[in-house]
Structures are given as structure tokens and as C-alpha cells.
């Protein structure tokens, strides 16, 4: 509970400092994006900003399971945030064609291209909405470098950056 309060207080300070009334998050259905979404909703509630101003986006890709996608959508609906679904499959497949990468080769190019496409979507929607991209990566991922450069390591405010994955 104390960690949630610290995260919420930090996000509130940032939102107030830049006079921001909207947030954009990529929601995967995993622990990190769930925590980031909960903190964002708590911050918006404390600021009296409608939850609809929190834009949660699930971005199914080439390896997305029904379970994680369902978890993401269910969580966003229960919390009453704006829910969007944008598939990255067509864009990533086109990218693979453009660079000559075989999509059957599931290497770092395969994984990282999807993360980068998702980040581009989040940044573009934040620009459209005059919102803040809330990062979901945690301290353990940042410390170990377990993220995609120009992908999920990028955000406008990394709300989980001080929280280890435990």
C-alpha cells in the first residue's frame, strides 16, 4: 500500500506540474501494466479527473494469447477507463517485408519490432490526445536491461521505475 501511495503521489506531482489531464498506457494483461494502470487510476481519482481520460490500449501482436488480451480488456472495463484495441500485426508484417526479415524467425528482431511498433502507437495517441505516456517497465527490467531500446523502455513518465519485480 505504501508503494502504491508513493507511485500515485509522484504521478500526481508530474501531472500537476505539466497540467496534463490525460494518460495513455499500453495494457498487456501482465503484472507491470496492471500496476501502472492501477496507479494511474488512483492518481486521476485523487485529482478529480474522470477515469475516461485514462486511455488503455491493448495491442495484440504475433504472439498474443487470448488469456492475456482478455485480462487486459477485462481490467480496463472494470476500472472504467477508455479502452482501445489496436493490432500491431499488419504494421509489423509490413515492416518485416520492408527489411527482409522472415516472420518465422522468432529472434530479437521479431520481438523488438513489435515492442517498437507498440511504443510508436502510444506516443502518437498521446500526441493526438495531449496526454502523457505512462511507462510500465519496472526497476528489475531497467536494471537488467530487459527491455527494447526505442520500445518499451521509452515513456513520458515511468511510474514503475522504482519498483522491483517481486
Residue positions per predicted region:
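A conserved beta-strand->alpha-helix junction
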Residues: 49, 53-109, 115, 141
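Active-site adenylate/phosphate-handling loop in enzymes that bind or generate adenylated species
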Residues: 44, 79, 103-166
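Short glycine/threonine-rich loop-to-helix capping motif typified by GTGT followed
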Residues: 27-40, 66-71, 98-99, 148-151
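RNA-binding accessory domains that recognize and position tRNA/RNA substrates
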Residues: 1-26, 42-52
Amino acid at each position: 500500500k505504501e508503494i502504491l501511495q508513493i507511485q500515485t503521489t509522484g504521478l500526481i506531482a508530474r501531472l500537476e506540474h505539466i497540467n496534463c489531464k490525460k494518460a495513455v498506457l499500453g495494457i498487456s494483461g501482465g503484472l507491470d501494466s496492471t500496476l501502472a494502470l492501477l496507479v494511474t487510476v488512483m492518481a486521476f481519482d485523487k485529482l478529480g479527473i474522470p477515469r475516461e481520460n485514462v486511455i488503455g490500449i491493448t495491442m495484440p501482436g504475433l504472439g498474443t494469447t487470448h488469456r492475456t488480451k482478455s485480462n487486459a480488456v477485462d481490467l480496463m472495463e472494470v476500472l472504467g477507463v477508455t479502452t482501445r484495441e489496436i493490432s500491431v500485426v499488419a504494421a509489423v508484417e509490413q515492416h518485416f517485408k520492408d527489411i527482409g526479415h522472415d516472420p518465422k524467425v522468432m529472434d530479437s528482431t521479431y520481438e523488438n519490432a513489435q515492442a517498437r511498433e507498440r511504443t510508436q502507437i502510444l506516443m502518437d495517441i498521446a500526441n493526438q490526445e495531449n496526454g502523457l505516456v505512462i511507462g510500465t517497465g519496472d526497476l528489475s527490467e531497467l536494471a537488467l536491461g530487459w527491455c527494447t531500446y526505442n520500445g518499451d523502455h521509452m515513456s513520458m513518465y515511468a511510474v514503475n521505475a522504482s519498483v522491483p519485480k517481486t
